[in-house]
Structures are given as C-alpha cells and as structure tokens.
C-alpha cells in the first residue's frame, strides 16, 4: 500500500538568494534516488522557507518490488570439458553465485548457449532506504560554502535544528547531519506555536499554517506577494516594480507574507529616481511604485514577516528606516553637483583599474581614443564620442556612486546633464554599460554604442594582454563584455571587423601587454561567444561550427552566414552537397601535388565532368557580386543547383585517374567547387 512521505529539515536562516535552488536540487536529487531504486510514487513536491527545507512524496510505495536478476555465466561450450565435466571456470562462476553448475539454467541466443543463474531479489522496505536517500540528496546540494557548528565536524549551509521523516503516520528513525528524526516541527519565530508535533505526513503543510503560522509552500507565498503587491500599488494609483529576482528574494525571507504600503516625503523625488530605487530595492528589499508614465511615486511596498495587530506601527518603522537612506542620497546628489563632472577627471589617477594596466585615468584615455576611432567607422560624431569617453568614468569619483555603487553610469548621465553637456554625450555615460546582461537593451545611439564598445574592448584586450583569460571564474566579466560587443555590432548591423578593432585597442596600451598572441586570443574568444549565443537562439552546433571554420571576423557578416547556412540546410540538396563537400575535402587532403589555378577545358573527357565544370564556371562568375554584397542566402540557394551535376560526376568519373594531368585537372575542378562553398562556410561539417 502506498503512503505519503515527508521529510523536513529545520535550520537556522537559509541564504535567501539560494533558497529556491537548494529546494529544487533537494527534490531533484531525492527523486533521482527513488528512480534508481525503482520506488514508485506519484510525484515529489518541495517546500522551503527561511528556516526549513522539506519534501513531500505522494503515494510512495512501501517497498521495492521483488525482481529476478539474471546473471550470465560462461558459454556452455566453455563450461564443460570433453567428458562433460564442469570446467574450473564454470565451477568458479557457480560458486560465486551460491549454486552448483548442475543448478544453473541455460540461455540460448543466436550466438550460442550460456549458463544462467536466476536470482530472486526481495525488494527492501522503504523505511530502510529513505534516510540514506535523503542524506545523499542533501550532500549533493549546490552549496558554495558550508559551515560547521558546535563541536561537530558536520558541515551544511546552515546549522540544522530539527529533522522529521514520516511515512504516513509512521516516524522513520534515523539521523542526518547530526540530528535524529522526531515529530517536532518549529513554527513561526514570532507567531503561532513555537514547537508542536505532527502525527502524519498527510497533515503537511496544512498543520504548519494552522498551528505554526508558517506558509511552507514557496510558490504560494510568492503568488500572495505578487497579487497583494499589485493591489496595494493600484490603491495608491500606481504599479509596483515587481522584478522577479527581488520577488524571489523577498519570498525567501518570509514565512508568513503580509504586504503593506508605506510612503516617503515628496521632496526626495528631486533626487534621480535610480538612486532612490537602488536604496529601496537593494538595501531594504522594498518594491518601488510608479505612475502610468513610469514616474516614481512617493510610495513603496514592503513585505512583513509578521501579522501585526497594529500594522501602522510596522509601516512607520519601515518609513523610519528608509528615510535616512533617502536623505543620504539627497545629500550626495546635492553635494556632487557642486563640482562639474569633468573636474573629477584627474582624481581617476588615484583609482587602479588593474595593477599591470594602470589607473582608471589610463583606461579613460584609451576609451576616449578608441571611441573616436569606432565613431569614425560607424558614422557617429567623433568629437561627442570622445567627450563621452573622457567623462565615462568620472562619476566613479562622486559620493553618490561611492555609496551606491550600482548607480554608476546613470548618475554620470544626471551630473553631465546638470553640467550642460550635450544630451547624447550625457546619455552615453549611462548606456556605456549596456548590455549589462543577456537580453538587456542595447545602447540607443551610435555615440553610446561607440563608447560601450570601446570600454568593453579595452577591458578584453587589456586582460587578455596580461595573460589573464577567464577560466572558471570571470572577475572582469570578459564573457559578458565579448557578447556585448558582438550584440551591438550584429543587431545594429555595423560594418566593423574585430581584427581592426582589436588591433586599435591593442595599440593604445603601448608596452603594457605581455601576451604576444593577444589579438588572436581575443578574437578567438569572441568568436567562441558566438557559439553560445547562437545555440541560445536555437541554431544547431553544426551550423555554427560550419561558419566558425571559416573564421569570419566581421560579426554582422558572421550573422548573415549563420542564417544563410541554416536556410540552406532546409533545402533538399543540402544533405547530398554536404556529403559531397566532405568527400571532396577528404580527397584533396590526401593529394600532395600542386593544383592548377584554372580548369583546363581541353582535358575534360567525360560528359559528367564537362557538365560540372561548365556549371562551376558559370556560378563562380555569377556569384562574385553576390558574395561581395554578402547575400549568402542567395549564394547558397544558387549553389544548391550543383547537386545533380555533382552527383553525376561522382557516379561517372574516376577522380584519381592514372593519367596525372587528368587527375590534377579533376582535382582542380573539385577544389574550385569546394571553394565556392568555403566562401561562405564549411558545409561538410553539417550533420544529417
């Protein structure tokens, strides 16, 4: 008979940003153990609060099913000697299985007859298995840094206080992480019963809500926070900024969510909203509220972990906490504006970018020069791009950014606007960091794009130039920087070549770089990011590899090739031509002679080779302007016309003829054929 199963681990406060991943991994690991043990069930559901991780398995089988295990022995031909007596090999196998040779069964196959032992294995009761399963599941959690507590050597992400393991109403005895299983559950720290007993797994999680004032269902808590926050924001005429990462963190901080609305003085709205939002979201875990025009309102929403009889006191307490932080932001904003941003430029000499690469002032000088170079290439205003590059890092020296680090860039924009800088220059100070993450917006102007690319390329070339390419960790966010440059170039269709960009960036470091292969290393690294990007976009690895094999260093051109090859692959001729290209590549690789520059028409003998040569020559001439214009999809569609003449050639022509001149001419034809495709990609790498 199947029963519901429960395991709850009571702990001290778990890290909120890791709570969901811990709970999901616990469930996944435990379910994998059940599957490996052939234990039937109707699903595993995880629960998680700041002070507990729990799993409930619906209708878990009470024991493993009995099964018959077949153990094959030696072949009958090797199991008996000429007189029919068991050989030592047969006797040893039988002894190892606790039987005699005579007791063995026979297994007949089309390859012969074998000795066989069928052993009936009784399934173990689930009570004997689940404690070990849970221990293994917990040991496999993604814990970045474990801790010890008390005098024990036991390690876990946080000290463990209670353990409850129930199968139906049966308490399963056992110990995990130094704590023995018991029926005791802990309630909310400030509400409900602090401790109480649970009689059956069926009571979970309802008993926690009823007696402990704890909502163990993580997703249910999150749903309440979202719904109540939306209602609360609407009540003050706005819409809450319910960023998922913050909602997840808040959900992980409370066991009994109570959504409340508070306010702050309107005078603080004179401060750039980004600084206020940084304080509310980053420091206090509050949800800002915006009006229909996306203008910040003097209200915020917060989630309390307690149901107070006097919610006004809770609201006033939170208002009292946030007020000094907003006042700090106001003070920093007013103080910083007393000095023009450009006056802070010399102070960048005091800030180190990287020991071997110099100060942030050095980096600023390089960004300024590189931004001007890029601006010229893409038709942006060079002078404004250089001005933006010069001011790009000056806000790092302001009090606001020093205190609220995530406001860098956006505060530079506000201060530059206050100083009377050009609007696009000011905007570039904010947009220089875009895209900041996968799927983020790109810089909106060419000037911003020039500065953003200059900043990222300077970091890439500099760090690679001193031999610190990312391996496991990526402290300088080089992967993000590389993808950012690629996205800007591709999505804005800039005709830029990584070779030129990297060479220019490298030249600005003077003799600071020690890696002689820095240019190749950076370009290869950036092209490697294409693989991850296009895989995320749904392109298969072989399509990406086919283009990478040609190492095109213009990102916008790379993009055209990938899309063209993807389109080509859907054509009827694709599989045949990919196989033919692979065959041609193999043939040419084995030839160590010298090929001619052109096909000698006089040496063509077979009708099939004449037809192919004619088609290749026609396409080579016709596709020259198509290749030059980068119309790769059109080019591959035309090259698909080669399918029939190529198939006919291989069916009717002996490539490796005895006559050397004839052989060389045929190889020259195949080489010219292959080069037509290689002008786009190596389609021989396409898989079926």
Curated annotation (Swiss-Prot):
Name listed for the protein in its UniProt record: Glycine--tRNA ligase beta subunit
Alphabetized GO MF terms: arginine-tRNA ligase activity; ATP binding; glycine-tRNA ligase activity
GO cellular component terms listed in the entry, alphabetical order: cytosol
Compartments reported by the entry: Cytoplasm
Superkingdom of origin: Bacteria
A biological process term (GO) from this entry: arginyl-tRNA aminoacylation
InterPro entries documented for this protein: DALR_anticod-bd, Gly-tRNA-synth_bsu, Gly-tRNA-synth_heterodimer
Record carries keyword GTP-binding: no
Family per similarity comment: Belongs to the class-II aminoacyl-tRNA synthetase family.
Top-level enzyme category: ligase
Keywords carried by this UniProt record: Aminoacyl-tRNA synthetase, ATP-binding, Cytoplasm, Ligase, Nucleotide-binding, Protein biosynthesis
One Pfam family from the record: tRNA_synt_2f
Oligomeric form and interacting partners: Tetramer of two alpha and two beta subunits.
Keyword Cytoplasm set for record: yes
Reaction equation(s) it catalyzes: tRNA(Gly) + glycine + ATP = glycyl-tRNA(Gly) + AMP + diphosphate
